[in-house]
Amino acid sequence: MKHLKKAFCLLLAAVMLLALGVPAMAAGEIPVDAEHFPDQALRTYVTDYCDMNKDNKLSAAECEAVQCIDLFEMKITKVADMTGIKHFTNLRELLVCGNQITALDLSGMAKLEKLDVSGCSKLLSLKLAGCSALTQLDASSCALTTLDLTGCSALKTVACSDNALTALDLCGSEQLT
């Protein structure tokens, strides 16, 4: 009995220390920090334009409310890492023209309709699997060698000039004009 009481007291003390030492984070909230948004320029954009209550966390409602991210309009050209972008599940338009990204994985972003990565001269890899609502893609003036648009069945316009493309897969993109 004495050992059980001691174990219970230790457990209670540990729980209290954890509760006092760790700030509460509601389920589903995403911290706007270097772990979730490694790129400082993107993190600043998210803080300024997506974190509506300025608590340095994105609630599910804040993530769902973001339908357009336009770095070009805001004259942001120093983003090198788009990690964290997939938290915005209702994203319809992503305009990152002229930024420093080398890879962009948007696979599974089923609501994305318009993507503009033109002028991202360091962009080597673009993944769009599962972007079934994508209708417009501008990937001109990048450094792409392959572009796989398989499964982007809603595509109507694609611009991919001024790349080093050796392979272009448009299978299933029957609406292209």
Language-model region placement:
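Consensus "Asn ladder" position of solenoid repeat domains
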Residues: 74-77, 99, 120, 142, ...
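Leucine-rich repeat
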Residues: 102, 123-124, 145, 166
